[in-house]
Amino acid sequence: MPLDIEELLRKKKAADTAAAKPRFIPKAERERLAAEKAKKEEDDKKRKASEEEQKRKEEEQKWRSNGSSRPNESNGSGRVPTGPRSMNDGRDDRERDRDRDQGRGRVRGKDRKGDKQGVGADKQSAEDIEATLLRSRYLGPQVNQQSNFSAKKKRMRTTEKKFNFEWDADEDTSRDNDPLYDRQTAVSHNGSFAGIGGEFDDGAEERARKRAKMIAQRDPENGKERAEGIMEDFFRARDKARQRADRRGLGKHWSEKSLDDMRERDWRIFKEDFGIATKGGMIPNPMRSWQESNLPQRLLNIVDDVGYKDPSPIQRAAIPIALQARDLIGVAVTGSGKTAAFLLPLLVYISDLPPLDEINKHDGPYALIMAPTRELVQQIETEARKFAGPLGFRVVSIVGGHQIEEQAYNLRDGAEIVVATPGRLLDCIERRLLVLSQCCYVIMDEADRMIDLGFEESVNKILDALPVTNEKPDTDEAENAQIMQRYLGGRDRYRQTMMYTATMPPLVERIAKKYLRRPAIVTIGNAGEAVDTVEQRVEFVSGEDRRKKRLQEILSSGNFGPPIIVFVNIKRNCDAVARDIKQMGWSAVTLHGSKTQEQREAALGSVRAGHTQVLVATDLAGRGIDVPDVSLVVNFNMATNIESYTHRIGRTGRAGKSGVAITFLGPEDHETMYDLKQILSKSSISKVPEELRRHEAAQSKPVRGAKKDKDEGSGKGNWQH
């Protein structure tokens, strides 16, 4: 019966449909199929492993059969007897090859030790050959038979970029290449008792005496003389070694060396010890003591009479530079002894000038010292008279607050040194009461404060009024001490200008660039930082009443004795705080800008004499005012900027003595909190309170407002105080 196409198509379609439908397989069926599949895979693995094992055995048998045919022919034994050659014409190729192998075997047999090792040795040789061939094919030829790997030696990775500074003794190639290392011997001769590095240790002399004693005992005739020679050689060698060590700067501290033995390394250590940093060309080394200062003996006697034992860091660095007639910029923390640092070289300078007489006394002073405040001027005048008086020099101060006629009267006999504030000095020059025709020595003390108080224009006019005939050239000659110390066609000398400041704002730098010639710059410590002798304490106390109560607790604690200075920000608070302090049982005076000059002098004199216990002041007293032995400074109001704060707390801890500064902070002081935290963190004896450390305003430097920047640029600081 023929196949029906339609039937076939129908069956195919039904089969495809059934195949497309998901088919449910019972669990037992699935487990059976999985077991059959696993068994099939296992059988395949066993079959493949068996085939590989059989193949390996066949190859091994083949190698063994090939290897066993050689030793029987090459072990030196006799050949199997054969018939005549004519009966052996039917030898196959294998027998011919065997004869050829026999000839090679005889040659190889000559190198073998004997017949007893024949079969075993040849079988091992075949295996070795096979292993060698396999190794050579897959691993390459053997080049280095001995490994130099050391587990102790650090291995560097190819990706490791860090340089290895370690050194291993095995890396020393000099012993292989330099024959000198092969002939090392222990050198022992008379006088060689030094230790490692040629230095004589504590036991060197004892070893020398033992050796001398041993030689004296062994040689009864000449031993004693030889022993004495050994000891003489030892002492001579030790002295030379010590001198050599001293010259290298390794033997003594700089304080124990003479000036001639000081090396560059010693001067570097000396400067680090005192926090001295210098900048400029041809700067001399600092002085270590007053005796090495090159000051005249009569000045040294005055220094001794005044009671200056050891020079301060600014005096050590600035005096040698100033004695070479160099222009100088001194950047030093407040209370560092700057006054004597510029007064002593000034007196040496004018000592070489002709004395004032009836003719030249009307040409003005030889030296001019400018300071920002009246109190600082009078303080410098008092200090200058201590040194200038015994030398016969006159010192006159010119400040506001006094009658100008009185100051003109003081100048009638002339003066070698004039100390003045810029405002009153310019007034005297414009009124023709004073000329500067022969002024050749100019000092600006607290130059940054003068600019803050608005004296920039006055300072420029005063400096422009100086004679130009003795002005220094702005060349390398300004750094040459010999040229600068020459006289200019008679009695004139090059003008010397010095500037002392605690900070270097741009306006001060502009004045220095205009009027100073190639100045040497001396920095003591870090500019703008407080001295390390002041312990700074900060307390968060807001509100006037709470601050007065806290001030009373501090004063009544008994930890601080008079004199004490309390700083406030505005003038009207001075009298109020002073009145409260008086109610606490303390005597108090005030000092601010509304006081007359007589009142200012009376207030300072009362505190210095010990008649008054507490001085309440504005920032007027924050700069340069020297009240001896101030034990405590209280910032009743935090200063408006960190520079004023630095100079406020600098009223204590002066002249090497210690002091305490306590500051009351409030929410209104957020602009200074960051700088205050920085200056506290740099102090070795002060701690940053946790509240200030975590305060939001202390985390980043504040952005100054436009109005404040304008005021600072105009030079109008706190002049109203």
Curated annotation (Swiss-Prot):
Spell out the Polar residues composition-biased ranges: 64-77
Residues annotated as binding ATP: A332, V333, T334, G335, S336, G337, K338, T339
Cite the domain annotation text. Answer: The Q motif is unique to and characteristic of the DEAD box family of RNA helicases and controls ATP binding and hydrolysis.
Protein name in the entry: Pre-mRNA-splicing ATP-dependent RNA helicase PRP28
InterPro entries the UniProt entry points to: DEAD/DEAH_box_helicase_dom, Helicase_ATP-bd, Helicase_C-like, P-loop_NTPase, RNA-helicase_DEAD-box_CS, RNA_helicase_DEAD_Q_motif
Q: What is the lineage of its organism?
A: Eukaryota, Fungi, Dikarya, Ascomycota, Pezizomycotina
**Placement of sequence motif DEAD box:** 445-448
Q: How does it assemble?
A: Component of the U5 snRNP complex.
